[in-house]
């Protein structure tokens, strides 16, 4: 019995008079029978109760079983939400499980004088009736499964008509979740105590926080459910609330899809048997036809999905197919035997592919086609050929099916048929007679040949025929009823008219709805083709003629029909579908073929391999890591000025620290000159370790945080302007230049091994000339201070360790640190080791350049003009004071920074060490450090650069610039 499974459950006797027979109990679960007992106990006492089981536990079946136990003379009203699916679900359960007479209240004329036991009514119908005093009911039940009590109109109507009279409330939603809902429910059932007559008093007692506040965690969840517990305790005596997880073994009672199928089968069978009054049938049909998406499971299963339009129609119409085929279509079944080849048929509505093995099967059992057939068959009474061309055309437009052979076979069949069968719709003939032999073309020609002027008139007639069933509705149905003498045709007409119009609309998306029905054009073309074609040539000539004749006056979209016809003429081949598929991928843009740009739910085309993937549309993603790892001049975490390269060997090695005056600078201003860019103070470094030449030597970047020096810089400084960025592959590493040493040559040789060295950059040309001028002094200084020069790595292992320790000692001895403001000119302070802060005069800032350049680095490296004794703190302070008082300061302050640097450099070189003051000015002014003030790296790197262990000579010179 549909999805209800018999379990041989014995009958349940509720009382001496009330008995739930085994016919009903065998289809119910034990927990449903428990609910029947619970509700009946209170119903017998005229007490209010709430059936509040969770959705899916079969509340409607429970109530149906309960109603079957009540005396038949008792009249029960069930008030529903305004939902056709709920109404159908109630009718289904009451009719399937019980023998009760059910009546649907629809208007003022309805009364309770009829011999019915159960009355179903939507609350909107009751509200429209107004005065319900003349309707006498013994029991009143309210179904809140559609949240009807959330509607203020429904609640007010129920309270006005039935306050205190409701016996059973059916609800899937927990009534304790809303205080207002529970208050109204208790009023309907007459269970509200006198002290809570007003909602304000009830709310004060059982107030629940707003769920929004609970979800936003402004209110404790435990407190919220504690309050809900108070409400549950208040109504526990007359409420039954159970949950799905308690009965997992028995659930689901039925699969949602199976329930939908059974519901539609029942609905179709009831309509075909005419067991319900005509008004009920029509209302049911109208509701299904107008609200196909609302055929939802109700009663037992309230959580099912919405039905699709086509599935409803197909399932609901299935019984009608068999009846109808028995009456009129039998003569047709004899014809198809001529050519029995399986034909691939695509239904225009569902786009479902059905492969019927033989024509008789296609005729009767096909759920999709036969209902449509019947409706149209009844409508097309005059000329079957015209209809055939019309309908097949629309279908051809949609799916490119095998339409031409069916057409001819249809005509062949129609020749032998009676006038009654001649009215059959082409669609059913196409499906059923797909495998028929080729028809005689004579009938075809006569039927379809028409001048071009006639199709308009025929279109009008066809419009009238096809549209009238939908518009006129019942009159057409009655006419059809007279023809077929069965109520099923009424349903068929409803469905089929609706669906036929849908087909036409779909087949002509670019035209107006009225034009959609003007399919006779296709008949014109077919007529022209067929007269020309002979019996033997029918298929190929149609293929050739259709495009040739119809091209001139065809609207856009028509050629597609001809092409599909051409392709379809191969009888049993499925090529029409395969040819129909390729256009789909063409819609996809090339870039969409890559997985990165596939849109959601976009189908991958079948001919994906044939489509070229347009690489130019895919944005180029630059490689990030490889260059960072390979090039010695690229930057990782630190830049040149921050790295001390230490060999991995135990032999003492002299560590060379290289600083780029260009590395740490902020993004260059195009208005600045090249020398200004080179000499401008640099910002705090953030770049990488390998940017020093140590990467070329294979030295590790150990102690990177402690090694900062502003005095030396590399030529490949432009890379470091973008810290931690991907290096430009076009700018190779050139190596580092150090004045007064051979490190430059050594590094450049190493760099040339890895990367070809381009010509010297133009922005350093002036400094390079000066470097070449004083090359002999560099060599001489190299001899005097051999520690600066790097030897081969194997011979330098121990020197590196001693150099590092030397630097650490100088850090403790160093007293002065300089604090600058974010790498800009001005805002400097001096901080000594004791914590004393002394400001620097602003005019001093103009005197001192922001950072040492190559010229001063060369001077420092040569060591010719430097003092041989390390000054004490007091000596350093006096030097600074003398520098501030120097008569050169204001003059040089007035000059530009570049002129000052060059002038001081030449003065220091050619003036020699004439006086300590001039020496200090020439050296200290241009080499005011930036990084040295920030960390211990300053003194360490200076000591290393000046020779490390060579003595205080170098250290004194470097520490003047703190």
Swiss-Prot record:
The keyword Phosphoprotein applies. GO terms for biological process: chromatin organization; chromosome organization; DNA endoreduplication; DNA replication; heterochromatin formation; maintenance of protein location; negative regulation of DNA replication; negative regulation of DNA-templated DNA replication. Expressed throughout development. Weakly expressed. Expressed at higher level in embryos and adult females. Keywords: Chromatin regulator, Chromosome, Developmental protein, Nucleus, Phosphoprotein. The modification Phosphothreonine is found at residues 438, 466, 810. Residues 360-369, 516-526, 825-856, 863-880, 915-944 have a biased composition (Polar residues). Residues 392-401 have a biased composition (Acidic residues). One of its GO terms (molecular function) is ATP binding. GO terms for cellular component: heterochromatin; intercalary heterochromatin; nuclear replication fork; nucleus; pericentric heterochromatin; polytene chromosome. Pfam families: SNF2-rel_dom. Its main location: nucleus. It is found in: Nucleus; Chromosome. Residues 1-278 are annotated as: SNF2-like. It comes from the Eukaryota. Residues 351-419, 454-474, 502-591, 660-711, 777-802, 825-900, 913-962 are annotated as: Disordered. Coiled coil: none annotated. The modification Phosphoserine is found at residues 432, 468, 827, 833-834, 838. Residues 373-386, 552-563, 674-685, 953-962 have a biased composition (Basic residues). Residues 527-543 have a biased composition (Basic and acidic residues). PANTHER family: DNA EXCISION REPAIR PROTEIN ERCC-6-RELATED, SNF2/RAD54 FAMILY MEMBER. Required for underreplication of DNA, which is found in many late replicating euchromatic regions of salivary gland polytene chromosomes. Functions by promoting the localization and retention of Rif1 to active DNA replication forks where Rif1 inhibits replication fork progression. Controls chromatin organization in polytene chromosomes. The SNF2-like region is essential for localization to DNA replication forks and for promoting underreplication. It is not required for localization to heterochromatin. Interacts (via SNF2-like region) with Rif1. This is Protein suppressor of underreplication. It comes from Drosophila melanogaster (Fruit fly). The lineage of its organism: Eukaryota, Metazoa, Ecdysozoa, Arthropoda, Hexapoda.
């Amino acid at each position: 019995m549909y999805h209800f499974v018999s379990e041989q459950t014995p009958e349940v006797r509720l009382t001496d008079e009330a008995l739930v027979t085994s016919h009903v109990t065998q289809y119910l679960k034990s927990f449903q029978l428990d609910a029947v007992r619970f509700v009946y106990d209170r119903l017998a006492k005229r007490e209010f109760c709430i059936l509040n089981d969770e959705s899916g536990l079969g509340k409607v079946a429970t109530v149906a079983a309960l109603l079957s136990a009540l005396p038949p003379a008792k009249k029960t009203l069930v008030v529903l939400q305004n939902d056709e699916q709920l109404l159908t679900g109630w009718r289904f359960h009451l009719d399937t499980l019980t023998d009760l007479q059910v009546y649907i209240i629809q208007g003022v004329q309805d009364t309770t004088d009829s011999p019915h036991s159960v009355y179903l009514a939507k609350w909107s119908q009751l509200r429209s009736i107004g005065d319900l005093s003349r309707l006498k009911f013994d029991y009143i039940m309210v179904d809140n499964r559609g949240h009807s009590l959330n509607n203020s109109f429904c609640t007010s109507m129920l309270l006005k008509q039935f306050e205190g009279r409701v016996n059973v409330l059916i609800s899937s939603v927990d009534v304790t979740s809303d205080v207002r809902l529970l208050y109204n429910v208790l009023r309907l059932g007459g269970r509200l105590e006198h002290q809570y007559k007003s909602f304000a008093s009830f709310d004060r007692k059982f107030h629940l926080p707003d769920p929004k506040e609970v979800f936003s965690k402004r209110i404790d969840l435990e407190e919220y459910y504690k309050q809900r517990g108070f409400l549950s305790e208040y109504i526990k005596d007359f409420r039954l609330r159970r949950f799905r997880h308690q009965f997992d073994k028995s659930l689901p009672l039925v699969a949602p899809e199976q329930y939908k199928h059974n519901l539609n089968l029942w609905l179709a069978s009831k309509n075909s048997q005419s067991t319900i009054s005509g008004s009920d049938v029509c209302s049911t049909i109208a509701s299904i036809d107008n609200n196909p998406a609302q055929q939802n499971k109700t009663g037992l299963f309230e959580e099912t999905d919405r039905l699709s339009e086509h599935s409803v129609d197909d399932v609901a119409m299935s019984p009608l197919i068999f009846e109808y085929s028995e009456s009129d279509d039998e003569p047709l079944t004899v014809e198809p035997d001529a050519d029995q080849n399986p034909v691939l048929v695509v239904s225009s509505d569902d786009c479902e592919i059905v492969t019927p093995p033989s024509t008789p099967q296609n005729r009767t059992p096909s759920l999709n086609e036969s209902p449509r057939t019947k409706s149209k068959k009844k409508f097309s009474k005059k000329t079957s050929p015209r209809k055939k061309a019309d309908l097949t055309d629309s279908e051809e437009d949609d799916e490119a099916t095998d339409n031409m052979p069916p057409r001819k076979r249809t005509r062949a069949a129609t020749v032998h048929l009676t006038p009654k069968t001649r009215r059959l719709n082409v669609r059913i003939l196409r499906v059923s007679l797909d495998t028929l032999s080729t028809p005689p073309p004579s009938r075809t020609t006569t039927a379809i040949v028409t001048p071009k002027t006639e199709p308009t008139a025929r279109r009008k007639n066809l419009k009238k025929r096809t549209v009238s069933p939908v518009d006129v509705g019942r009159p057409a149905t009655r006419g059809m009823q007279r023809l077929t003498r069965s109520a099923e045709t009424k349903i068929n007409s409803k469905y089929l008219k609706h669906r036929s119009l849908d087909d036409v609309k779909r087949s002509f998306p670019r035209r107006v709805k009225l034009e959609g029905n003007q399919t006779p054009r296709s008949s014109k073309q077919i007529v022209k083709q067929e007269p020309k074609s002979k019996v033997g040539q029918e298929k190929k000539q149609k293929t050739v003629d259709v495009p040739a004749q119809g091209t001139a006056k065809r609207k856009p979209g028509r050629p597609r029909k001809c092409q599909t016809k051409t392709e379809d003429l191969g009888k049993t081949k499925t090529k029409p579908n395969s040819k129909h598929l390729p256009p789909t991928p063409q819609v996809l843009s090339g870039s969409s073929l890559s997985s990165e740009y596939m849109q959601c739910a976009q189908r991958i085309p079948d001919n994906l391999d044939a489509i070229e993937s347009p690489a130019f549309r895919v944005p180029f993603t630059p490689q990030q890591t490889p260059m960072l790892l390979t090039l010695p001049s690229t930057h990782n975490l630190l830049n040149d000025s921050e790295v001390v390269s230490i060999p991995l060997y135990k032999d003492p090695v002299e560590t060379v620290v290289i600083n780029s005056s260009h590395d740490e600078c902020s993004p260059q201003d195009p208005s600045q000159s090249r020398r200004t860019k080179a000499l401008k103070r640099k910002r705090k470094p953030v770049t990488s370790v390998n940017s020093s030449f140590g990467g070329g030597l294979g030295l590790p970047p150990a102690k990177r945080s402690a090694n900062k020096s502003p005095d030396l810089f590399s030529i490949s400084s432009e890379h470091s302007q973008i810290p931690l960025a991907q290096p430009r592959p076009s700018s190779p590493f050139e190596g580092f230049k150090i004045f007064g040493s051979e490190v430059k040559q050594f590094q450049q040789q190493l760099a040339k091994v890895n990367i070809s060295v381009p010509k010297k950059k133009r922005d350093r040309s002036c400094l390079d000339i000066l470097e070449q001028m004083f090359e002999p002094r560099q060599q001489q200084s190299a001899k005097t201070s051999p520690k600066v020069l790097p030897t081969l790595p194997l011979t330098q292992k121990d020197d590196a360790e001693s150099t590092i320790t030397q630097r650490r000692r100088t850090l403790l001895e160093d007293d002065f640190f300089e604090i600058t403001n974010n790498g800009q000119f001005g805002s400097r302070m001096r901080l000594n080791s004791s914590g004393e802060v002394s400001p620097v005069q602003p005019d001093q800032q103009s005197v001192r350049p922001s950072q040492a350049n190559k010229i001063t680095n060369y001077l420092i490296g040569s060591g010719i003009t430097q003092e041989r004794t390390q000054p004490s703190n007091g000596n350093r302070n006096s030097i600074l004071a003398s520098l501030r008082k120097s008569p050169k300061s204001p003059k040089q302050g007035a000059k530009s920074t570049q002129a000052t640097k060059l002038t001081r450099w030449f003065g220091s070189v050619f003036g020699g060490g004439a006086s300590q003051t001039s020496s200090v000015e020439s050296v200290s002014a241009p080499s005011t450090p930036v990084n040295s003030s920030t960390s211990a790296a300053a003194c360490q790197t200076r000591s290393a650069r000046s020779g490390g262990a060579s003595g205080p000579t170098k250290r004194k010179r470097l520490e003047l610039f703190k």
